[in-house]
UniProtKB/Swiss-Prot annotation:
Binding note for cofactor: Binds 2 heme b groups non-covalently.
Segments crossing the lipid bilayer: 44-64, 88-109, 124-144, 189-209, 237-257, 299-319, 331-351, 358-379
Protein name per its UniProtKB record: Cytochrome b
Residues that hold heme b b566 according to the record: H108, H207
Binding sites annotated in the UniProt record for heme b b562: H94, H193
Family: Belongs to the cytochrome b family.
InterPro entries tied to this protein: Cyt_b/b6_C (IPR005798), Cyt_b/b6_C_sf (IPR036150), Cyt_b/b6_N (IPR005797), Cytb/b6-like_sf (IPR027387), Cytochrome_b (IPR030689), Cytochrome_b_C_euk/bac (IPR048260), Cytochrome_b_N_euk/bac (IPR048259), Di-haem_cyt_TM (IPR016174)
GO MF annotations in UniProt: metal ion binding; ubiquinol-cytochrome-c reductase activity
Positions contributing to a ubiquinone binding: H212
Membrane topology: Multi-pass membrane protein
The organism of origin for this protein: Metridium senile
């Protein structure tokens, strides 16, 4: 039986290694050499792939029934909820899938910062581009239901482009397709929201190819060329375990509290004549929104908001430690958890009204956010080099 099994598996193995298409898949997710000590924190990459598939599948079916017209958009969402078979599930899986996507994304980025994965520059840079494009895709999608928060969120965020000197107003009108957020705006947002997930999928493949070239990082941050295992079955089984746990949590959210992370204002149809009391984006944008609000100057706020994302590109260049990750760096580890707390504080501040004491707390939290990347990260690396690797003699 063993001989039969081995003889039977050899043609399959040969086929997957020699076939021009399957050989690429084989190199990326089957025979990929992976460090033997990866923890469950490395599961979030596969979970992001699952989230993207769920979002694309539910999004395609939702698009079959959605109308990108300002007079029909809100009603078409209502039609999906009431009249389309399992339309309510499609919508709730898509809406909450975005939240799960960003939850996994923030864990994935946090793990990369903690374990120093940014030292693999190509993989990291493609990942940051993916992160920014995902935020753009989510923003475009949030506008589509054409509720109050959708309309006013689109108005406020697109208006930020007017802060660009000289050409800002022209850019805003070009984005709107007119002199205000209108039917042209909704149409182009829907078109781009449908397109960008396919761009994300393509960039995801590029991300994997870069990872295949440079190799995976690991929890202790040392070279692991002599201690590697094939990705399948060692890590595919681990990924499946994570996927099952994720699906249980995701389904619990969708079935038991589908509107928990939504905004009640978005159940009211968009009305350009009535401004909501408090305009705020979805929870996964709140940290950047809090940074935007913390700076009184409009252009300064816009620059700070975009800088809060683009600053991730600088991490490989501000890394001064001789150690890759924070596993053996006591000072930097404390600073990292302060930064995580600061991120959550900014998220909370972003959903609070613009009044004291929230304004000053938001400003202090914003200062610490940038100080972590630009000051603490290189400074603590330098200090730890002196403490952990003292010069002899």
């Amino acid at each position: 039986m063993v001989g039969y099994a081995m003889g039977h598996s050899r043609p399959t193995m040969q086929f997957r290694k020699e076939n021009p298409v399957l050989s690429i898949v084989n190199g990326i997710i089957i025979d990929l050499p992976a460090p033997a000590n990866l923890s469950y924190m490395w599961n979030f990459g596969s979970l992001l792939g699952v989230c993207l598939v769920v979002q694309m599948a539910t999004g395609i079916f939702l698009a079959m029934h959605y109308c990108s017209d300002v007079s029909l958009a809100f009603a078409s969402v209502d039609h999906i909820m009431r009249d389309v078979n399992y339309g309510f599930l499609l919508r709730y899986f898509h809406a909450n899938g975005a939240s799960m996507f960003f939850l996994c994304l923030y864990f994935h980025v946090g793990r990369g910062i903690y374990y120093g994965s940014y030292t693999k520059v190509e993989v990291w840079n493609v990942g940051v581009v993916l992160f920014i494009l995902t935020m753009a895709t989510a923003f475009l999608g949030y506008v589509l239901p054409w509720g109050q928060m959708s309309f006013w969120g689109a108005t406020v965020i697109t208006n930020l482009l007017s802060a660009i000197p000289y050409v800002g107003t022209d850019i805003v009108q070009w984005v709107w397709g007119g002199f205000s957020v209108s039917n042209a705006t909704l149409n182009r947002f829907f078109s781009l929201h449908y397109l960008l997930p396919f761009v994300l999928a393509a960039l995801g493949v590029v991300h994997l190819i870069c990872l295949h070239v440079s190799g995976s990082n690991n929890p202790i941050g040392v070279r692991s060329d002599l201690d590697k295992v094939p990705f399948h079955t060692y890590y595919t089984s681990k990924d499946w375990y994570g996927i099952v746990a994720f699906v249980l949590f995701f389904c619990s959210l969708v079935y038991l509290a589908p509107n928990l992370l939504g905004d009640p204002e978005n159940f009211i149809q968009a009305n350009p004549l009535v401004t909501p009391v408090h305009i705020q984006p979805e929870w996964y944008f709140l940290f950047a929104y809090a940074i935007l609000r913390s700076i009184p100057n409009k252009l300064g706020g816009v620059v700070a908001m975009f800088a809060s994302l683009l600053i991730l590109f600088l991490l490989p260049w501000v890394h001064t430690s001789r150690l890759r990750g924070l596993t053996f760096r006591p000072l930097a580890r404390v600073a990292f958890w302060f930064m995580v707390t600061d991120f959550m504080l900014l998220t909370w501040i972003g959903c609070q009204p613009v009044e004291e004491p929230f304004i000053i707390v938001g400003q202090l939290a914003s200062v610490f956010f940038f100080a972590y990347f630009l000051v603490l990260s290189p400074l603590l690396g330098y200090l730890e080099n002196l403490l952990l690797f003292p010069k002899k003699g």
